Amino acid sequence: MDIQVKNGSALNVSEQVFGREYNEALVHQAVVAYLAGGRAGTKRQLSRAEVSGGNTKPWRQKGTGRARAGTSRGPIWRTGGVTFAARPRDFSQKMNRKAYRAAMRSIFSELLRQDRLVVVESLTVEAPKTKQVIKALNDLGVEKGKRLIVTEAMDEALLLGSRNVIELGYRTAGTLDPVSLVEADKVVITQGALKMVEEWLS
């Protein structure tokens, strides 16, 4: 199948990668797995075995008029430990490589169907200036909404020039993730990056 490039030429790509049916369930699984993998999961509380103090009986068993107590570490005490103390946990979800790649193929196919994939021969700016990046995108007709630039290799000028623009992301073909692709209204990708993606997902 052929994809139109902004310079007017056509780029031949694999229909096995860019002509798939949209599998919403699989894409959802990939997005959830990616977001879950980014969770820190560092919450931790002290149990009654870990709080300080409480080594001795606070007062004698009988004769004080107060309720009997053996330790001040118990959960009903103000400085006591937590009953079921939280522990750091791993939120990451396992997703098979085959399923993940199928989800990415599904996303790229849907981007192409919805005319949200803009293929350019190359995308460079002379200096790391926000103005130049915005002008380059405007020249391509990508002016509004959430935009994502994808190149085959890291371009320092593009990176520095784009990071101050609201709703504009920048990735290389090797660092693409399902969330940034799904969220983008327009994905501007270079021919070289598209070929790298095709090779990866073939």
Q: Language-model features: where?
A:
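Extended polybasic, low-complexity segments that bind anionic RNA or targeting/receptor surfaces
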Residues: 1-40, 85-202
